[in-house]
Regions:
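Basic nucleic-acid-binding interfaces
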Residues: 1-98
Length: 98
C-alpha cells in the first residue's frame, strides 16, 4: 500500500526549527537524545508518523553532511532531530561542526 502525505507550511517550519535547534544544542554541548515534541494543534499528524527522512547540510552550496533513513523507526519530528545532529557531528566524510 503506497504511503501518501504532504507537509504543511507549519510542519516544514517546525522541522526546520527542530533541525537547527538540535545542531545548536550539539554545538553548545547540551544535546539531548529526547527531542522537543511538536506544538499542539497542528492540522495533521504527519509529524508523529513513523517516517524516513534525510537531513542534508550545506555550507556555501557545498555538501557538509547528509544522514538519513529510508524507513521510519520513530516519529518524523524525532527522526529529524536525531538526523540533524548526526549530519552535523557524525557524518564520517566530514569533521564535526564546531
Amino acid at each position: 500500500m503506497p504511503l501518501s502525505f504532504s507537509l504543511t507550511p507549519a510542519d516544514k517550519t517546525f522541522l526546520g526549527h527542530q533541525a537547527r535547534t538540535a545542531i545548536e544544542a550539539g554545538l553548545a554541548g547540551v544535546y539531548s537524545s529526547t527531542p522537543p515534541a511538536p506544538p499542539q494543534g497542528l492540522p495533521d499528524d504527519v509529524l508523529t508518523r513513523s517516517l524516513g527522512a534525510f537531513v542534508t547540510l550545506t555550507i556555501n552550496h557545498g555538501l557538509r553532511g547528509c544522514i538519513g533513513n529510508i524507513i521510519g523507526h520513530e516519529a518524523l519530528y524525532a527522526t529529524v532531530w536525531h538526523l540533524a545532529a548526526a549530519a552535523a557531528f557524525q557524518d564520517p566524510r566530514f569533521p564535526p561542526l564546531t
